[in-house]
């Protein structure tokens, strides 16, 4: 089947995270001349497809996920019965990211690779906890001395048109929970209470929206963003016993968890508080002079006639795991204007260009 037909079939699998619904087997059958390793961890299914072309040379990999978020209500059609209409294919996962997977499967099948090894790393655990997916496959590959030198993760990176954006890194994510203790009491006797809301009020303006670093050419500043704040019992005559606050920092490599801890401790000095911090993902950056960045840039410009912005915008992705294992990685895919949305769709023209970009990259790497 051709690339579009393959994508339509792939979109029919109801692969709501972490269930692959048979999609991984379907992909393995399409690339029957690749070695297939089904790697399962804690019930999560993953697939490594790999093909050796020669003994010496570079190992290029593509990464992606077949799992999707739930469709929800309000779709014009069944979210897992793809509809082709006015140049688009409508289905859950059309942009995020079965189009990317279908594109690199088609490229791997048809391109003439001159390197040593070509691999496809696929998981059904990216939209959920993302602990036993790509990370588990890379761990498996490391144990067998099979880690790739370079990788492309086919997440939907483009904003307005195919070719306008390549991700060369991602910010990390630090989650914070802050508890300010007080002493509950009657509102008519404030002198007998310790009101944590009043105590914390001067600190709030030092926390909310604060930039922990000035940013750089590649990264925006690491900003503290408050996501939840609550205290009290929902009544007007009792002061709160405590105040609970949650926040997130999308951090660049210039700001660490210890930097966040140090700043919060400084501004909360004198308060009775508890602070809990967790790094849920780590920042990374692939140098713009690296071969994978240069070659991807060349292929994108050649096929799309666009000059892509090389950036680190947006949330996190499985590319962080490649970087953690020392693999030089970039991300490139279709536009992301309808990811996780009702009536998610992908432009057929964009998808066809993506297939050509990946094919050109493989052949000229």
From Swiss-Prot:
HAMAP family: DapE. Belongs to the peptidase M20A family. DapE subfamily. It comes from Campylobacter jejuni subsp. jejuni serotype O:2 (strain ATCC 700819 / NCTC 11168). Binds 2 Zn(2+) or Co(2+) ions per subunit. Zn(2+) 2 binds at residues 96, 127, 340. Catalyzes the hydrolysis of N-succinyl-L,L-diaminopimelic acid (SDAP), forming succinate and LL-2,6-diaminopimelate (DAP), an intermediate involved in the bacterial biosynthesis of lysine and meso-diaminopimelic acid, an essential component of bacterial cell walls. The active site is at residues 67, 126. It is an enzyme of class 3 (hydrolase). This is Succinyl-diaminopimelate desuccinylase. NCBIfam families: dapE_proteo, PRK13009.1. Its EC number is 3.5.1.18. It catalyses: N-succinyl-(2S,6S)-2,6-diaminopimelate + H2O = (2S,6S)-2,6-diaminopimelate + succinate. Disulfide bonds: none annotated. One of its GO terms (biological process) is L-arginine biosynthetic process. Pathway: Amino-acid biosynthesis; L-lysine biosynthesis via DAP pathway; LL-2,6-diaminopimelate from (S)-tetrahydrodipicolinate (succinylase route): step 3/3. Its cofactor is Zn(2+); Co(2+). Keywords: Amino-acid biosynthesis, Cobalt, Diaminopimelate biosynthesis, Hydrolase, Lysine biosynthesis, Metal-binding, Zinc. It comes from the Bacteria. SUPFAM superfamilies: Bacterial exopeptidase dimerisation domain, Zn-dependent exopeptidases. Zn(2+) 1 binds at residues 65, 96, 155.
């Amino acid at each position: 089947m051709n690339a579009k037909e393959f994508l339509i079939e792939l979109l029919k699998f109801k692969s709501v995270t972490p269930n692959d619904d048979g999609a991984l087997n379907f992909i393995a059958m399409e690339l029957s001349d690749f070695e297939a390793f089904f790697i399962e961890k804690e019930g999560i299914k993953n697939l490594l497809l790999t093909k050796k072309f020669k003994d010496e040379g570079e190992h290029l990999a593509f990464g992606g996920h077949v799992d999707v978020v739930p469709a929800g209500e309000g779709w014009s059609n069944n979210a897992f019965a793809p509809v082709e209409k006015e140049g688009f294919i409508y289905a859950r996962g059309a942009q995020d990211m079965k189009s990317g997977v279908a594109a690199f499967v088609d490229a791997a099948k048809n391109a003439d690779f001159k390197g040593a090894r070509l691999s496809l790393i696929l998981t059904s655990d990216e939209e959920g906890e993302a602990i036993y997916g790509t990370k588990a496959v890379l761990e498996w590959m490391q144990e067998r001395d099979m880690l790739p030198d370079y990788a492309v993760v086919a997440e939907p990176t483009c904003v307005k048109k195919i070719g306008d954006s390549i991700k060369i890194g991602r910010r990390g994510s630090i989650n914070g929970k802050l508890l300010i203790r007080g002493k509950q009491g009657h509102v008519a006797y404030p002198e007998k209470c310790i009101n944590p809301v009043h105590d914390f009020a001067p600190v709030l303006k030092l926390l909310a929206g604060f930039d922990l670093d000035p940013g750089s050419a590649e990264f925006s500043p690491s900003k503290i963003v408050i996501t939840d704040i609550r205290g009290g019992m929902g009544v007007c005559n009792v002061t709160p016993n405590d105040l609970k606050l949650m926040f997130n920092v999308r951090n660049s490599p210039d700001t660490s968890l210890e930097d966040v801890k140090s700043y919060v401790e400084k501004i909360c000095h004198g308060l009775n508080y508890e602070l809990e911090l967790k790094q849920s993902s780590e920042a990374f950056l692939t140098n713009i002079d690296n071969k994978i960045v240069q070659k991807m840039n060349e292929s994108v410009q050649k096929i799309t006639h666009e000059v892509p912005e090389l950036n680190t915008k947006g949330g996190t992705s499985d590319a962080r795991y490649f970087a953690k294992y020392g693999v030089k990685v970039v991300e490139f895919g279709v536009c992301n204007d309808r990811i996780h949305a009702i009536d998610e769709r992908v432009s057929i023209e964009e998808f066809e260009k993506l297939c050509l970009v990946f094919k050109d990259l493989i052949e000229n790497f």
